[in-house]
Curated annotation (Swiss-Prot):
The lineage of its organism: Archaea, Methanobacteriati, Methanobacteriota, Methanomada group, Methanococci. Its EC number is 6.1.1.1. L-tyrosine binds at Y40, Y159, Q163, D166, Q181. ATP binds at S219. This is Tyrosine--tRNA ligase. Belongs to the class-I aminoacyl-tRNA synthetase family. TyrS type 3 subfamily. HAMAP family: Tyr_tRNA_synth_type3. NCBIfam families: PRK08560.1, tyrS. The keyword Aminoacyl-tRNA synthetase applies. It catalyses: tRNA(Tyr) + L-tyrosine + ATP = L-tyrosyl-tRNA(Tyr) + AMP + diphosphate + H(+). GO terms for molecular function: ATP binding; tyrosine-tRNA ligase activity. Catalyzes the attachment of tyrosine to tRNA(Tyr) in a two-step reaction: tyrosine is first activated by ATP to form Tyr-AMP and then transferred to the acceptor end of tRNA(Tyr). CDD domains: TyrRS_core.
Amino acid sequence: MLIFVKSGENMLESILKNTSEIVSIEELTELLKKEEKIAYIGFEPSGRIHMGHYLQIRKMIDLQKAGFKIVILLADLHAYLNQKGTMDEVRALGEENRKVFEAMGLVADYVYGSEFQLKDEYTIDVYKLALSTTLNRARRSMEVIAREDENPKVASVVYPLMQVNDIKHLNADVAVGGMEQRKIHMLSREILPSMGYKAPVCIHNPVLTGLDGEGKMSSSKGNFIAVDDDEATIKKKMKNAFCPMKEVSGNPVLEIAKYYLKYPATVKRPEKFGGDLVLESYEALENAFVEGLHPMDVKNLVSEQLIEILRPIREKMNK
């Protein structure tokens, strides 16, 4: 696959698009000047890859086009510590996830955590990190990620230290993740320099709300659109999605419209309901919705575009 590398301001503009936060833009700008640079993201192997994952993968593709070598950590050992299944189960899921990422068009080095996280050098560094991190700081960094548990395991404290250590051992210049990763990434910027390693640039992407409007989109909750869902499934899920009239905040349908749809976009309606409506931007869509555009009109628009956006992935997965 050919990768067309962008240059100058176009690279930075592409990376900035649809991000929630970059720490820091100045450091990223300097990093873009280097010939060799690595960007990494870690994924706990998951049952289905959904639109929330796709938001992250698209950012990795932006970084790839900006000249970064991309490393995808298939975090099998992390998943095990986070009680997602046996090592064999999460490894099998990891292989399925890798195939989907490749179908998305991402060219990357895929690394399983268990390939390096059980080595002596890695383990010693985890001990060093443990000496540099208070118990409260480690636990706070996991609050958003770990499953709620009335009796948290010691593993929930080891997990963030391992994630910080991954950045060092993968030689990453940039760490990418959703906003739920922010506390761990900030921990890495604080303590890695004390071990003689650079503080990574951290790129945080939005976390999509689940289709039920409750919490984040998650394969374990079933409130997602998978990137390989067929047309009928996409339409059904979107039809049933939470989309309260005139409400923008926490609206999963509008979030998908914001981050995925191409504009100008046309809402197709019968003449008796006002006829077709051309929207030049997401802001125009949001304004129309607040002013009374029917949720089903928005859902139909999103379904129509999602089907086309995901078509190449479905076709590759079905070969």
